[in-house]
Regions:
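Short amphipathic alpha-helical interface segments
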Residues: 10-15, 88-101
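Short amphipathic alpha-helical interaction segments
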Residues: 33-43
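Short capping segments at the starts of secondary-structure elements
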Residues: 16-22
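Short, Lys/Arg-enriched N-terminal segment that forms or immediately precedes the first helix
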Residues: 1, 74-85
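A short acidic, leucine-rich amphipathic alpha-helix
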Residues: 25-29
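Phosphate-centric recognition/catalysis
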Residues: 1-8
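Charged low-complexity interaction tracts in eukaryotic proteins
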Residues: 43-75
Length: 101
């Protein structure tokens, strides 16, 4: 796997996991050494910061990582989530609720 693919794999795993995940678990999934994964994660952090990306990679003690939205964009994210929450239920969703009740 190329470094670009390793970085992409880490992004995908962090995005899908949503919660902080241990370096060892990421290393196991990539079949890489934990130190290599830490170096890759630090590269991702730097890239996101340099690009002023809407996403950020956070590090938590002891040795966990998480992808999340950058705080600067929090208000906009909140607005879109509030809009989605107030959306009416689709006919299919109403049908499912009718079956459950």
């Amino acid at each position: 796997m190329t470094e670009r693919q390793e970085l992409g794999s880490l992004e995908a795993m962090l995005f899908a996991h949503a919660e902080p995940v241990e370096t060892a678990r990421l290393a196991d999934a990539l079949r890489l050494d934990a130190d290599e994964v830490t170096t890759l994660l630090q590269k991702l952090q730097k890239r996101y910061d340099e690009q002023e990306s809407g996403m950020v990679i956070l590090y938590f003690e002891p040795d966990r990582w998480q992808m999340t939205t950058r705080p600067y964009y929090g208000e906009m994210v909140k607005r879109i989530l509030d809009t989605r929450r107030n959306a009416p239920l689709s006919p299919a969703a109403l049908e499912v609720l009718a079956v459950i009740c």
